[in-house]
Structures are given as C-alpha cells and as structure tokens.
Swiss-Prot record:
Homodimer. The reaction proceeds by a bi uni uni bi ping pong mechanism. The keyword Phosphoprotein does not apply. (R)-pantoate binds at Q61, Q155. ATP binds at residues 30-37, 149-152, 178, 186-189. InterPro entries: Cyt_trans-like (IPR004821), Pantoate_ligase (IPR003721), Pantoate_ligase_C (IPR042176), Rossmann-like_a/b/a_fold (IPR014729). The gene is panC. The active site is at H37 (proton donor). GO terms for molecular function: ATP binding; pantoate-beta-alanine ligase activity. Coiled coil: none annotated. It comes from the Bacteria. Pathway: Cofactor biosynthesis; (R)-pantothenate biosynthesis; (R)-pantothenate from (R)-pantoate and beta-alanine: step 1/1. This is Pantothenate synthetase. It comes from Serratia proteamaculans (strain 568).
Amino acid sequence: MVIIETLPLLRQQIRRWRQDGKRIALVPTMGNLHEGHMQLIDEARARADIVVVSIFVNPMQFERPEDLASYPRTLQEDSEKLTRRGVELVFAPAPADVYPQGLEQQTYVDVPGISTMLEGASRPGHYRGVATIVSKLFNLVQPDLACFGEKDYQQLALIRKMVADMGYDINIVGVPTVRAKDGLALSSRNGYLTAEERKIAPQLSKIMNALAEQLSNGERHVDELLEQTAEHLRNAGFTPDELFIRDADSLQPLGVESQRAVVLMAAWLGKARLIDNQQVDLTL
C-alpha cells in the first residue's frame, strides 16, 4: 500500500492505473476508521481492481473551529488497518494542498434543495462542504465507482444528485449501516461516549425501529409520531436534535403517492451526536 499526500503524485499514480485498464473504486473518509468503514472497503474491493481510500478531515464542512480541532486524527492506526485490508492507495493530503488559496477563495459546489433541507437547515454550509470535497476527490481520483454508507442518508442522497446533475460517470454505491451486536450504528462519534452512555446508546435504534414499525402498520399522523418519539428519547436519556419522517426517494414530506418512507434521527448523548435512519416500505 502506498500513502500519497500531494495532488501531482496522486494524478501520476491514477494515470498509470488508467493506462493499464484498471477499474478504480474510491472510499472517501475523514479517518478514525472503524468496522463500518471496512465494510465500505470490502464492497469497493468486490467491485474494482484498485481501492483508493481518502483520509481528509475537511475543514469546509465544520461549523465550529473547536469541532474541527478536536476531531480525531489517527493516520498511523488507520494506515495499519487499511494495509491489512489490502487497500492499494491512501490519499491523505493536508488542507493547504486541497485548498491552496484558503476556504474564502475556494470554488464551491452547492447542491440546491438537499443541502439546505432537514439537517442542512440547522447546519448551514455543511453539505456544501461535503459536496465540494467529494467533487474534488472525484476529479482527482477519477473513480469508476465510489462507496458511501447509508447511515448518513441525506449525504448519500446529496452525492447521488450531484453526480446526476454534474454528469459524472461514476457509480455511487450505498452500503448498509453496520451495527454493533446491540444495534448501535457504528460511528467515529461513539468514541465520545462514556461507559454509562454506551449502555444507553442502543436505545436510539430501538426507539427508531418502534417508530418505523408504526409507519409500517399504517400510522400516518406524522406530527404525533414525532412528538411521541422525542418524548421516548428524552425518557431514555437523549436530547433530541433532528427527527424527520420523509419520502425515502425525494426527502420531501410524505404524500399519498409515497411508497417508501425514511425515518431520520439525530440525538445528543453526552458529548456525542448520534445519527441513524430506517427505511420503511409503505406498500405492504
């Protein structure tokens, strides 16, 4: 495995693989890798000759400087995990290489609608930062496919719309959420949980699944369902942050023609902001 930190060296290596007719998969990450990331890599490996993993803590998608500063940087440990997984290349640039003129002078990629709805409404600029860095990685790596986790449902929808709108010839592969045995979705943020909070954390997915079951059984009073769910979360020890029930395909409010719903949840537990989602078939 090779670790590349500069754009010219990355382009050089990608050009060689392209000349050899290799099929390339990209797995974009911010590092601090866990088993969920490994599942993305395994999916990429099954679909391509070459797997490229990017590790870049993107300052453009952080609202608060203290959050950016405190985000774990674990390149050595990550590299060891990726070597064992058989990854061919890790792209780990410095912010100055990605944004040489600084963030203020950087050209942005803005995906209208999705980037400012739901979670984007309370995190202005976040999804613009995501779209910009992913677009830049697509241009640099020129992958045939890219793998993203379904845990961040809105992000996956954003990337798919960007690819369609911009005409990228890249297959976007959504990989199901990886969970611990007790149901908690794997996340780098889980490391912020205390031992006691970790015992409480699986209640998030249980409460979410209960809501999904009510939808599956025909309940459609969305506001009442969300109020009940918020109360269940508070009783379990969480501070609800974002709770939505939306059409799984459009992310718009449920309508009479909606065939699939998605429950989107974000809640604070101590210092950890946990997110999760569950899709529901409304046609059964």
